[in-house]
A protein has these predicted regions:
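Non-catalytic accessory segments flanking enzymatic or RNA/DNA-binding domains
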Residues: 1-149, 161
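Short beta-strand-centered aromatic/proline hotspots
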Residues: 163-169
Length: 169
């Protein structure tokens, strides 16, 4: 039986390099299901929806993306089983453009909705970005310039001030 639902594009600041593309009869209930988990630091948010008249029509979108680039989908082997998920390594804008093209081909562009972020979502996005930036900074090799110590300046060993060196980076 056909029923109106939506193909959705979800984002999550916990993994900004991925989008989740799926189907839901009720997008609000789907968000509640996904965001109930304590396993992810930030909540999923709806980037866009595309109203459709048949369940599981998202599988057709998955098939198109997989045929164009099978490396975009999140697939892993875990405990001897292959886990194939609805996550794709693409920007939400790229995912949206795929749905937009399909909507235009079918003359249903009015059924495609891009959802604006509210203030709480913007704040969570900024927090996640700050955490990611901090993490990247901690992973990068140490440079004295990170401590505002410039080339040519001299530093000394704290346990023996007679041991000195000149900064060259």
């Amino acid at each position: 039986m056909d029923k109106t639902g939506v193909i959705y594009i979800l984002t999550n600041p916990s993994f900004p390099e991925y989008v989740k593309i799926g189907y839901a009869d009720d997008i609000d209930k789907r968000l509640l299901q996904l965001n109930r988990s304590e396993c992810i630091p930030f909540a999923f948010r709806v980037y866009a929806t595309y109203e459709v008249n048949s369940r599981l029509s998202d599988l057709k979108i998955h098939s198109i993306i997989d045929k164009l680039n099978p490396n975009l989908r999140s697939i892993e082997n875990f405990n001897g089983k292959q886990r194939i998920r609805e996550f794709y390594a693409m920007s939400p804008e790229d995912a949206y453009s795929i749905l937009e093209a399909i909507a235009e081909i079918h003359g249903c562009a009015d059924k495609l909705k891009r959802i604006a972020m509210d203030e709480a979502q913007k704040q969570a996005e900024e927090t996640a970005q700050e955490i990611d930036d901090e993490h990247k900074e901690r992973q990068s090799p140490f440079r004295f310039s990170m401590c505002n110590i410039q080339p040519g300046e001299e530093i000394e060993y704290c346990n023996n001030p007679e041991i000195k060196c000149t900064i060259v980076d």
